[in-house]
Amino acid sequence: MAHSPVQSGLPGMQTLKADPEELFTKLEKIGKGSFGEVFKGIDNRTQKVVAIKIIDLEEAEDEIEDIQQEITVLSQCDSPYVTKYYGSYLKDTKLWIIMEYLGGGSALDLLEPGPLDEIQIATILREILKGLDYLHSEKKIHRDIKAANVLLSEHGEVKLADFGVAGQLTDTQIKRNTFVGTPFWMAPEVIKQSAYDSKADIWSLGITAIELAKGEPPHSELHPMKVLFLIPKNNPPTLEGSYSRPLKEFVEACLNKEPSFRPTAKELLKHKFIIRNAKKTSYLTELIDRYKRWKAEQSHEDSSSEDSDVETDSQASGGSDSGDWIFTIREKDPKNLENGTLQPSDLERNKMKDFPKRPFSQCLSTIISPLFAELKEKSQACGGNLGSIEELRGAIYLAEEACPGISDTMVAQLVQRLQRYSLSGGGASAH
């Protein structure tokens, strides 16, 4: 590949033809982030420890727009509460993204050994709020706030990570109406594809607060496709159990279904739960040490199992999701969108050239496309048949072209059946 699609016109991209393998020493693999693998590394010029995300652009063709988005947003950010970005280098088909090294793990990792106390929860939430306050003041929204996307340094500093679906708010109303994020943490207005703003991040923060307290988000036992229908329909989740009234009120304030009634990040920094409980971030080093001890014990117990392949340091942009179907829905390339719905690739268009051009079901871009991307990724990881998955995806597009709207009908029927199955005792109740 002579020229990468991201080689020119990308903010933050190094224009010098420097060889990243000469500038940086790549050490052990420490994570699997969005789009690529993450390595610990050394900047040979300064001897500073860095994180190196390496992406094969030939394998990540479908994610080029998201990679560009992440680099663009990170290169525009300058905050102690956002993961620092040092630059990008292109070598052959490999893109090297150099970032701040954060060796304390993700907030999700820190939950693995056991629950957090309310002082730890408040301290982490305060730092997330500082990051959100900065982003929102810069007219940016993160759109994928969750514990897995919150990273810590070895000294307890807390930083926001994974900006692959972040959005720039540019119009006078400061609204977006794109459908991105991770289902369990998504605000109702995002799922309904209504216009939304930075208050969508506040809803996700409320879900993250429940996640930090309980170890998982609400509805985690359900299939994400079902959750996409439950969140707009049901009352907002509440934090149940023996937690303090201020923490429950903090969650309740974030999880108001009316976005305008949710507080801003700046207002939440003054909430009594934060003021009364949050401590200096150095307090979190005890939590990091606990996680490292637990991880060492686990590696001894599981050394002969496939868990030896699991990344350990978690400089991972959301790479710690435990569920097989906790996918992040990413915004599609505008060039492949028409009237807000996903259009087929050139290959699919060639297959369908004899059909008249018609609009496609909305669910193709919001549900089916991300689902097939996840299927392909998991099939590739276990040596499955990628061709069969691609054939099935192509068949759905062909059926859609022949009968517009059939995919929306199919998904609606699937959800109804899931709900009936759930209510008849086959799973958790939808009510």
UniProtKB/Swiss-Prot annotation:
Per the UniProt entry, the Enzyme Commission number(s) are: 2.7.11.1
For activity, the cofactor(s) needed are:
Mg(2+); Mn(2+); Co(2+); Zn(2+)
Biological processes, Gene Ontology terms: cellular response to oxidative stress; cellular response to starvation; execution phase of apoptosis; intracellular signal transduction; intrinsic apoptotic signaling pathway in response to oxidative stress; negative regulation of cell migration; positive regulation of axon regeneration; protein autophosphorylation
Provide ranges: composition bias, Low complexity: 313-324
Please state every residue range assigned to the domain named Protein kinase: 24-274
Keywords noted in UniProt:
Acetylation, Apoptosis, ATP-binding, Cytoplasm, Kinase, Magnesium, Membrane, Metal-binding, Nucleotide-binding, Nucleus, Phosphoprotein, Serine/threonine-protein kinase, Transferase
Q: Which SUPFAM superfamilies match?
A: Protein kinase-like (PK-like)
Q: Which reaction does it catalyse?
A: L-seryl-[protein] + ATP = O-phospho-L-seryl-[protein] + ADP + H(+); L-threonyl-[protein] + ATP = O-phospho-L-threonyl-[protein] + ADP + H(+)
Q: What is its main location?
A: cytoplasm
Its PTM note reads: Proteolytically processed by caspases during apoptosis. Proteolytic cleavage results in kinase activation, nuclear translocation of the truncated form (MST3/N) and the induction of apoptosis. Oxidative stress induces phosphorylation. Activated by autophosphorylation at Thr-178 and phosphorylation at this site is essential for its function. Manganese, magnesium and cobalt-dependent autophosphorylation is mainly on threonine residues while zinc-dependent autophosphorylation is on both serine and threonine residues.
Any one Gene Ontology molecular-function term assigned to this protein's record: protein serine kinase activity
> Where can this protein be found?
Cytoplasm; Nucleus; Membrane
Which residues are annotated as modified residue Phosphothreonine in the UniProt record? T178
Give the enzyme class: transferase
Where do the annotations place ATP binding?
I30, G31, K32, G33, S34, F35, G36, E37, V38, K53, E100, Y101, L102
What are the catalytic residues? D144 (proton acceptor)
| Residue numbers covered by motif Nuclear export signal (NES) | 323-374
**Residue numbers bearing the Phosphoserine modification:** S4, S308
Q: Where is this motif: Bipartite nuclear localization signal?
A: 266-280
**What cellular component terms from Gene Ontology apply here?**
cytoplasm; FAR/SIN/STRIPAK complex; Golgi apparatus; Golgi membrane; nucleus
UniProt function note: Serine/threonine-protein kinase that acts on both serine and threonine residues and promotes apoptosis in response to stress stimuli and caspase activation. Mediates oxidative-stress-induced cell death by modulating phosphorylation of JNK1-JNK2 (MAPK8 and MAPK9), p38 (MAPK11, MAPK12, MAPK13 and MAPK14) during oxidative stress. Plays a role in a staurosporine-induced caspase-independent apoptotic pathway by regulating the nuclear translocation of AIFM1 and ENDOG and the DNase activity associated with ENDOG. Phosphorylates STK38L on 'Thr-442' and stimulates its kinase activity.
Subunit and partners: Monomer. Interacts with CTTNBP2NL. Interacts with RIPOR1 (via C-terminus); this interaction occurs in a PDCD10-dependent and Rho-independent manner. Interacts with PDCD10; this interaction is required for the association of STK24 with RIPOR1. Part of the core of STRIPAK complexes composed of PP2A catalytic and scaffolding subunits, the striatins (PP2A regulatory subunits), the striatin-associated proteins MOB4, STRIP1 and STRIP2, PDCD10 and members of the STE20 kinases, such as STK24 and STK26.
Identify its protein family.
Belongs to the protein kinase superfamily. STE Ser/Thr protein kinase family. STE20 subfamily.
Entry protein name = Serine/threonine-protein kinase 24
Organism field: Rattus norvegicus
- The gene designation is Stk24
